[in-house]
From Swiss-Prot:
It is an enzyme of class 2 (transferase). This is Dimethyladenosine transferase 2, mitochondrial. The keyword Zinc-finger does not apply. The keyword S-adenosyl-L-methionine applies. Gene3D superfamilies: Vaccinia Virus protein VP39 (3.40.50.150). The lineage of its organism: Eukaryota, Metazoa, Ecdysozoa, Arthropoda, Hexapoda. It comes from Drosophila melanogaster. S-adenosyl-L-methionine binds at I46, E99, D125. It is found in: Mitochondrion. Probable S-adenosyl-L-methionine-dependent methyltransferase which specifically dimethylates mitochondrial 12S rRNA at the conserved stem loop. Also required for basal transcription of mitochondrial DNA. Also regulates mitochondrial DNA copy number. Stimulates transcription independently of the methyltransferase activity. Its EC number is 2.1.1.-. Residues 421-436 have a biased composition (Acidic residues).
């Protein structure tokens, strides 16, 4: 059985004042993690040993089924969960600890001194890895390579090269993971790592929902994530088990995303996700940027109609889509033991992907928002195989988009420089109202939203 815990309301009452919080945690955590609550912190730390023990028990079957001998812990902080990793001596021969705060470094370095061959320590901000990538691109530096120097490298089709554990509340972090797979840079250049993360419910729902939730939540990012990754929900973990504390959610009438932001605000979702081993069979690596642009461009509005949009690139292609003699191949759940009724509200099961999962009865009124991720992948595969593809204006638009990527100010705003903002789009801080620990030094000019 899992250790007993206090209810959310009782635990919150126990530490409702700043003084009580500081009294309990000041020995292990710096004041800036205790002094004020945040909307949604990008970096989070396990607050106590009881929480670490609960999480360890949730992850027991996942660790046991993994043959990986390398694990990376993000922001290990006071080391509560690190102790459980150290106890798995027969499994984890290498433990990489990445820490972004100076306060915790002396204690973490002690672990390296005790286990010099097994524990490797790096100071750096993994959650903001996209910033390091951008800085390296600007000055030819090696920040990313240095931070990941202890990570074993494997071929993409091999088994996973490491497990990554942490608590992350940063939406740009997950967008960077998508871009890393698409453009074969950064983390996934070293192999397919499996991530086990505690994350805010709105982000997980946004990434794993289907079109039944509505066009405001089911975004191009949702489609890309589900095409690229296999995902599995593990458990809900109490938000009060993590520092810094979070402000109480108070819905506003003007919020477009109230129904998502109000789901389980007192919890984080413990989930795992891994890049698909057969990704390059579904879409060749050199075609991944084209797939990315195809989805981004056509989801400028999910109400865009498929045939009129594609005929802008390949005139007269509509009849090929309407009259399709090929039989469709269905997709199946990757984890059959995962019961849909036990999944978080609005999230869906991870399924296999197919390039022959045709949307039934496509017509001139069918919208891109009607298609599921596997059906979008199938549509792109059809489009890619047409003889007109090589001479289509799509490739010129793609080339222009990639050129803009090279000059974009920073990765979270790449889409603004590459495609039109999505109709009635929700910005990153609307999907999850996060607070960045490092304020931007230069205001970024944003385009006005396009109306369709």
């Amino acid at each position: 059985m899992l250790p007993l815990r206090c209810s959310w309301s009782f635990a919150r009452a126990n530490y409702s004042t700043k003084k009580e919080l500081v009294t309990r945690y000041s020995g292990d955590f710096p004041e800036k993690l205790l002094n004020r609550k945040q909307k949604v912190p990008t970096h989070m730390y396990i607050a106590n040993s009881e929480a670490a023990a609960r999480i360890n028990q949730y992850l027991e079957p996942h660790f046991q089924s993994s043959g990986c001998d390398t694990v990376m812990e993000l922001n290990s902080g006071a080391g509560y969960f690190t102790r459980h990793l150290l106890d798995r001596e027969s499994q984890f021969r290498r433990i990489i600890l990445l820490e972004s705060m100076d306060h915790f470094m002396p204690k973490i370095q002690e672990l390296h001194t005790l286990y010099p061959e097994r524990v490797k320590v790096r100071q750096g901000d993994f959650v903001n890895l996209w910033k390091l990538v951008y800085m390296d691109k600007m000055d030819g530096g090696s920040r990313v390579a240095d931070l990941l120097s202890d990570v074993p490298q494997k071929a993409f089709t091999d088994d996973i090269n490491m497990l990554v554990f942490g608590a992350v509340g940063s939406y740009p972090f997950f967008k960077h993971l998508i871009n890393s797979l698409i453009f074969q840079t950064s983390l996934f250049n070293l192999g397919r790592c499996e991530m086990i993360l505690a994350m805010p419910p709105p982000i997980y729902i946004h990434l794993t929902c289907n079109n039944e939730i509505g066009y405001l939540i089911y975004r191009s990012t949702s489609v890309l994530f589900q095409i690229l990754f296999e995902h599995k929900f593990i458990a809900k973990v109490p938000r009060e088990d993590f520092l810094p504390q979070q402000m109480a959610y108070s819905p506003t009438k003007s919020s477009k995303l109230g129904k998502v932001q109000s789901i389980n605000p007192e919890y984080l979702y413990l989930v795992k996700f891994t890049p698909r081993r057969n990704l390059h069979e579904l879409c060749q690596s050199q075609d991944l940027p084209a797939l990315w642009f195809f989805i981004k461009q056509n989801y400028v509005s999910r109400r865009n109609r498929i045939i009129p949009n594609l005929e802008k690139w390949v005139p007269g292609c509509g009849p090929r889509l309407i009259i399709n003699p090929k039989s469709s191949e269905s997709v199946t759940p990757i984890y059959p033991d995962e019961l849909p009724k036990k999944l978080p509200q609005y999230s869906c099961q991870s399924t296999t992907m197919s390039t022959r999962n045709y949307y039934p009865g496509i017509n001139i009124y069918t919208q891109f928002g009607d298609l599921l991720p596997s059906q979008i992948l199938t549509l792109f595969s059809q489009f890619r195989q047409w003889p007109e593809y090589g001479e289509s204006s799509f490739l010129a638009s793609l080339e222009n988009a990639l050129l803009k990527l090279e000059t974009a100010n920073d990765e979270p705003n790449l889409e603004d420089g590459v495609t039109l903002p999505e109709e009635d789009d929700a910005e990153a801080d609307e999907i999850i109202e996060e607070e960045s620990p490092v304020p931007a030094t230069t205001p970024v000019k944003r385009r006005r939203k396009a109306s369709s």
